[in-house]
């Protein structure tokens, strides 16, 4: 009855699909040709008609798929019965090889069977992929149907509102009708796809199973053919060797060259046997890889099929996790690459032996006589046998190389399948509970599991595994070497302590402190801390090699997993010694370091064994003890981590450094509080059943902190190097200044006293020089680089479980319309896209802040650039980063440039009118940065302002005048107004001085005085040369003009001061008085009578009115 109802529904849907009217494609094609040939061109009409044709083509494809789905529904009983009958009729035994087949026939049969096997394997894989695609589509079909119906309703609404009879309206009508027909066919197709999904999936599974069985039979038959071929080749080689050896036994005194051929043939025969064995092993590895790939694919399909039921059952999650845990490990392709390279080398050797055979026929006896007939017959038999062996080895080598290539491909497929399973595990199982929530009976479960663990013959397995580890060559040698390394470390510990004391004594002394001391301390500290972790790793390796004892292997996995943590903790303890790296070299306070290492013994004695036990329970008996003993270990680990983290916070270790390099900021406190609260949240998550999720997140969080601490150590190492360099430079300058002072003092004393003075022996003060003020810009650059490295490292670390956050892609926030090749479609903007956009904006902000400084300090300052060019490059780089980051970030949330450009254009026009002055200044700033009419450091005069350019921004330029006042000038003024740049291409400027001289002075003498003063002035340049001219005679005074040149604007005022002093000194030396402007004074008597005397400025009287 159910089958009849399904058939009727499918028939109704298919009838609706076929009955849906659609425009005639021929008519649309004719209209399109006419539109293309029309004058003038009609691009909108052409685009609409072309869109209609594309929609009709898609409709045709949907109709074909509807027929296929309908056939599957109608013929499913018959098709499934046929496939099951074929499966039941297949023989379990493979085909037998005919014993009378020759070598050539076997080779030909092997080629044919290999081709058939490849086809069947490909067919099985295709059917598996088809079944997986059908399973994946089941979750997407409802949403696709909803979207298609919504689009269809929108098309129908637009069809109802379309009016007009123009060619464009008709073309748009054709496009809408075609889209409507396409969407109707698509809705029917999706309905039938959903109805026939189970049938199609079952048929694909049956076809895949049938192809897999056929491929297994072909593989067994192919292996039998290869075994038969190898056996024939070995038999022929052995017969040939026996016959030639029989001839050799009957002949005596054979030459050495013939005896050597016997040895070579035996070696070639042994190589042929080894090649046959290796080919059998490769074939078995191929079968194993194929079966493992099938197992992984089945686990992947099971995981995807059962993913929708994970939220309703914890047992299902546990079962799926156990199934994933039983999957094989990732293959190692490096071994195959090495073997393939060795095969190619062997092939060259065999070809060389073949090429040497003509030369071997020309050998002679030891006395130079030619070979006898018997010896020639033996030699020919040997060479014939050798040639057959070499040909067999070459053919077998090529076959083995081909099989190794197939094995490599199979391993690659297995690796891809394992990656897909890993991604699917993170996607579907990461946020599902893997153990039952804790109840009141949980302590009883712990006691029962502990009793059960002891009853598993634990100590006996460990004892037998230890005996196996001590008796195996593969494990005893590394263990013995690790013990020797530990002994050497204990013996050399006192030398290391003395080295630390000597190094610490030199730290801070200018002439003895070197950066090499810090590097040596870093290297030896890491080396001294390594022996115990190496021994721990060796023990783990030995236990993992004890494969007959699962408990020992699980413990070995736990021991190996704790090696990095143990090594890091021991390195930190070595760094924290009183004379170690942290205190003596970095200058960290001893109390802070002691507080940070307060729980060192707890880390070694509690956290490391607990992590080892946790990993052991995760790898033992399908995680049988994870819910009880494993969860207990994890809770204890979280508690210990919270205590250790609190201790590190109190020690003042920074997780975030601000611009000043200080960790005392709110971001640092927030990060530490998050780190303290993370283990407590993990305890709560494990209590409610999310043990594996809590483990993965907490492990990556703590690893992120470890990465940051490593970069913090690197930062302080670089900081110490900068401190040493700065301190040494300052000390060299101090010595130079002291030497100059002593030299000046010595020049004022007598020679005898100079030799007898105790100051002649200069003692260099080697006390510590307090120069801790390192370049803030360099340190800021280092912090920026390390922050970017930390960000990238954390992104790579967390990207391993990025698929676990795939649920964010299912949380749709809003929809946007995107147009691709003229077809509009709705795309949802998810929460994951928004978070990625926020991350892009954060990275862009960091790059904008730090990358220009990185360019300036790392690259630009080492280039020979004109003033201001570096600033222009960094500014343009900053704007480009902002533009690219903005476009990428906005595109993540659906705001594409194709939509944004119109808004930008409209805003540009509107703001251009409303804020035209600001936009003019902005554009002028860009012009200034590119054309560079002014640069930072130039001296300019604009309007009535003169000063030096100190800053060029995109809106305004800052000028500092001679009064040290900062003047903000809009950039538009430098583009639209006239201004003077005193130092654009040539910083040399002319200074013109007007010098008066008395009328009775010799003009040539005055000219020489002025030129001499100019030549003696230290700020006057020689080229162009100074010039003096007698330019005027005013009221009995000679007016001279001195024209001199200064190298830069800053020299103009000091030059005037110095040249005036030199001119006054020159006039005084030559007895020339500086004249002053003439004036006349008329004297009147006290009683009002006029005396008739007039005094000139020179004090000489003359009659009024006289000349």
UniProtKB/Swiss-Prot annotation:
Compartments reported by the entry:
Cell inner membrane
Q: Which family does it belong to?
A: Belongs to the MscS (TC 1.A.23) family.
Q: Which organism is it from?
A: Escherichia coli (strain K12)
Keyword list (alphabetical) reads: Cell inner membrane, Cell membrane, Ion channel, Ion transport, Membrane, Signal, Transmembrane, Transmembrane helix, Transport
Share an example GO biological-process annotation for this protein.
Answer: cellular response to osmotic stress
Q: Which PROSITE patterns match?
A: UPF0003
- Protein name stated in the entry: Miniconductance mechanosensitive channel MscM
Q: Which Gene3D superfamilies does the entry mention?
A: 1.10.287.1260, 2.30.30.60, 3.30.70.100
* Molecular function in Gene Ontology: mechanosensitive monoatomic ion channel activity
The record describes its membrane topology as: Multi-pass membrane protein
Q: How does it assemble?
A: Homoheptamer.
Membrane-crossing segments per the record: 467-487, 522-542, 551-571, 600-620, 628-648, 674-694, 698-718, 785-805, 828-848, 875-895, 910-930
């Amino acid at each position: 009855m159910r089958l009849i109802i399904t058939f009727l529904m499918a028939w109704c849907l298919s009838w609706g699909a076929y009955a849906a009217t659609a425009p005639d494609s021929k008519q649309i094609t004719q209209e399109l040709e006419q539109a293309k040939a029309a004058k003038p061109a009609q691009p909108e009409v052409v685009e609409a008609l072309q869109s209609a044709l594309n929609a009709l083509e898609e409709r045709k494809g949907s109709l074909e798929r509807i027929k296929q789905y309908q056939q599957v529904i109608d013929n499913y009983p018959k098709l499934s019965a046929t496939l099951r009958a074929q499966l039941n009729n297949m023989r379990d035994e493979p085909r037998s090889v005919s014993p009378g087949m020759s070598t050539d026939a076997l080779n030909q049969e092997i080629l044919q069977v290999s081709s058939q096997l490849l086809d069947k394997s490909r067919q099985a894989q295709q059917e598996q992929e088809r079944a997986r695609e059908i399973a994946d589509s089941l979750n997407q079909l409802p949403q696709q149907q909803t979207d298609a119906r919504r689009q269809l309703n929108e098309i129908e609404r637009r069809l109802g509102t379309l009016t007009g009879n123009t060619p464009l309206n008709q073309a748009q009508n054709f496009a809408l009708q075609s889209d409507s027909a396409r969407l109707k066919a698509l809705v029917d197709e999706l309905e039938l796809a959903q109805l026939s999904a189970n049938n199609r999936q079952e048929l694909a599974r049956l076809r895949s199973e049938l192809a897999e069985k056929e491929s297994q039979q072909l593989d067994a038959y192919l292996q039998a053919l290869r075994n038969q071929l190898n056996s024939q080749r070995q038999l022929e080689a052995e017969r040939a060797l026996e016959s030639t050896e029989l001839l050799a036994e009957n002949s005596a005194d054979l030459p050495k060259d013939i005896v050597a051929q016997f040895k070579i043939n035996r070696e070639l025969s042994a190589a042929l046997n080894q090649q046959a064995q290796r080919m059998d092993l490769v074939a078995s590895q191929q079968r194993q890889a194929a079966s493992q790939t099938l197992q992984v694919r089945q686990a992947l399909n099971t995981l995807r099929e059962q993913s929708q039921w994970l939220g309703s059952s914890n047992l299902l999650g546990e079962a799926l996790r156990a199934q994933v845990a039983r999957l094989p490990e990732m293959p190692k392709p490096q071994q195959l690459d090495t073997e393939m390279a060795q095969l190619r080398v062997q092939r060259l050797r065999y070809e060389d032996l073949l090429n040497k055979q003509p030369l071997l026929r020309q050998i002679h006896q030891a006395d130079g006589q030619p070979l006898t007939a018997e010896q020639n017959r033996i030699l020919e038999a040997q060479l014939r046998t050798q040639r057959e062996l070499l040909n067999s080895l070459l053919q077998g080598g090529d076959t083995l190389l081909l099989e190794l290539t197939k094995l490599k491909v199979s391993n690659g497929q297995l690796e891809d399948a394992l990656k897909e399973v890993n991604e699917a595990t993170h996607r579907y199982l990461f946020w599902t509970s893997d153990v039952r929530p804790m109840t009141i009976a949980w302590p009883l479960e712990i006691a029962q599991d502990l009793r059960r663990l002891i009853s598993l013959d634990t100590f006996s397995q460990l004892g037998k595994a230890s005996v196996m580890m001590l008796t195996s060559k593969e494990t005893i040698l590394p263990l013995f070497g690790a013990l020797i390394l530990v002994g050497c470390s204990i013996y050399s510990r006192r030398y290391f302590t003395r080295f630390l004391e000597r190094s610490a004594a030199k730290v801070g002394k200018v002439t003895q402190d070197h950066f090499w001391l810090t590097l040596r301390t870093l290297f030896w500290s890491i080396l001294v801390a390594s022996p115990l972790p190496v021994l721990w790793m060796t023990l783990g390796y030995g236990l993992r090699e004890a494969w007959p004892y699962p408990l020992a292997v699980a413990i070995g996995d736990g021991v190996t997993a704790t090696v990095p943590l143990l090594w890091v903790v021991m390195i930190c303890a070595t760094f924290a010694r009183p004379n170690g790296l942290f205190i003596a070299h970095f200058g960290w306070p001893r109390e802070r370091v002691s507080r940070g290492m307060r729980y060192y013994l707890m880390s070694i004695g509690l956290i490391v064994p607990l992590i080892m036990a946790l990993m052991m329970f995760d790898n033992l008996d399908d995680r049988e003890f994870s819910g009880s003993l494993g969860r207990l270990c994890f809770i204890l680990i979280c508690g210990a981590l919270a205590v250790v983290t609190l201790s590190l916070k109190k020690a003042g270790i920074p997780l975030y450094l601000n611009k000043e390099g200080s960790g005392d900021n709110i971001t640092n406190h927030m990060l530490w509080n998050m780190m303290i609260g993370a283990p407590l949240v993990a305890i709560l998550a494990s209590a409610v059943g999310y043990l594996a999720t809590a483990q993965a997140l907490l492990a990556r969080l703590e690893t992120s902190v470890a990465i940051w601490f490593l970069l913090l150590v690197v930062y302080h190492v670089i900081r110490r190097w900068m401190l040493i360099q700065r301190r040494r430079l300052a000390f060299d300058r101090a010595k130079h200044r002291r030497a100059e002072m002593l030299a000046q003092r010595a020049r004022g004393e007598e020679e005898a006293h100079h030799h007898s003075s105790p100051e002649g022996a200069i003692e260099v003060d080697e006390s510590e020089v307090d120069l801790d003020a390192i370049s803030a810009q360099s340190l800021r650059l280092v912090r920026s680089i390390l922050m970017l490295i930390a960000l990238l490292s954390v992104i790579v670390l967390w990207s391993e479980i990025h698929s676990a956050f795939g649920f964010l892609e299912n949380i749709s926030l809003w929809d946007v319309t995107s147009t691709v090749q003229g077809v509009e479609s709705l795309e949802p903007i998810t929460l994951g896209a928004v978070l990625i956009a926020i991350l892009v904006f954060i990275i862009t902000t960091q790059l904008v802040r730090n990358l220009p400084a990185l360019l300036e300090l790392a690259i630009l300052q080492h280039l020979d650039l004109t003033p201001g060019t570096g600033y222009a490059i960094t500014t343009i780089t900053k704007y480009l980063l902002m533009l690219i980051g903005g476009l990428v970030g906005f595109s993540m949330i659906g705001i594409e440039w194709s939509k944004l450009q119109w808004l930008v254009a409209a805003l540009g026009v509107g703001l251009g009118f409303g804020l035209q002055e600001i936009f003019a200044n902005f554009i002028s700033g860009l012009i200034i940065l590119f054309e560079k009419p002014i640069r930072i450091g130039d001296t300019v005069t604009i309007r009535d302002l003169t000063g030096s350019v100190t800053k060029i921004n995109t809106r305004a330029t800052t000028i500092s005048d001679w009064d040290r006042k900062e003047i903000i000038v809009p950039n538009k003024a430098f583009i639209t107004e006239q201004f003077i740049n005193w130092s654009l291409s040539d910083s040399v400027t002319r200074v013109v001085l007007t010098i008066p001289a008395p009328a009775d002075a010799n003009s040539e003498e005055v000219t020489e005085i002025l030129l001499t003063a100019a030549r003696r002035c230290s700020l006057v340049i020689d080229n162009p040369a100074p010039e003096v001219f007698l330019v005027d005679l005013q009221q009995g005074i000679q007016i001279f003009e001195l024209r001199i040149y200064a190298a830069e604007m800053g020299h103009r005022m000091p030059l005037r001061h110095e040249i005036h002093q030199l001119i006054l000194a020159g006039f005084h030396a030559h007895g020339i008085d500086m004249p002053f402007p003439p004036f006349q004074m008329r004297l009147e008597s006290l009683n009002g009578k006029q005396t008739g005397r007039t005094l000139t400025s020179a004090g000489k009287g003359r009659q009024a009115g006289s000349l």
